[in-house]
Amino acid sequence: MSLNAETKAAIVAEYARCENDTGSPEVQIALLTASINHLQGHFQAHKGDHHSRRGLLRMVSSRRKLLDYLKGKDLSRYQDLIKRLGLRR
């Protein structure tokens, strides 16, 4: 259910703030968003997979906390990220 290494590397390269950046909130949120989108397709085919649904809810919660942190830290970076990811906030 996880993303492969090439997909992760592409996401990190796109959202990184500098060359070796893998831990900034933008990168973490982008990786979580990709994983969430991947899992949503899984749940269309496997509606009864409640164990994975719990993992999905944990990812959504973690992304929400990171978004709240980024919003409080730097509003312009937050708004730019929301626009780039296509999130509805």
Swiss-Prot record:
Q: What is this protein called?
A: Small ribosomal subunit protein uS15
Q: Does the keyword Ribonucleoprotein apply?
A: yes
GO MF annotation: an example: rRNA binding
Task: Write down the NCBIfam families for this protein, in alphabetical order.
Answer: S15_bact (TIGR00952)
By sequence similarity, the record places it as follows:
Belongs to the universal ribosomal protein uS15 family.
Under the subunit heading, UniProt states:
Part of the 30S ribosomal subunit. Forms a bridge to the 50S subunit in the 70S ribosome, contacting the 23S rRNA.
Q: What does this protein do?
A: One of the primary rRNA binding proteins, it binds directly to 16S rRNA where it helps nucleate assembly of the platform of the 30S subunit by binding and bridging several RNA helices of the 16S rRNA. Forms an intersubunit bridge (bridge B4) with the 23S rRNA of the 50S subunit in the ribosome.
**A GO BP entry:** translation
Give the encoding gene's name.
rpsO
The organism of origin for this protein: Vibrio cholerae serotype O1 (strain ATCC 39315 / El Tor Inaba N16961)
Which Pfam families does this entry report, sorted A to Z?
Answer: Ribosomal_S15 (PF00312)
Question: Do you know which InterPro entries this protein is assigned to?
Answer: Ribosomal_uS15 (IPR000589), Ribosomal_uS15_bac-type (IPR005290), uS15_NS1_RNA-bd_sf (IPR009068)
Keyword presence, Manganese: no
List the record's Gene Ontology CC terms alphabetically: cytosolic small ribosomal subunit
- UniProt keywords, alphabetically: Ribonucleoprotein, Ribosomal protein, RNA-binding, rRNA-binding
Q: Which domain of life is it from?
A: Bacteria
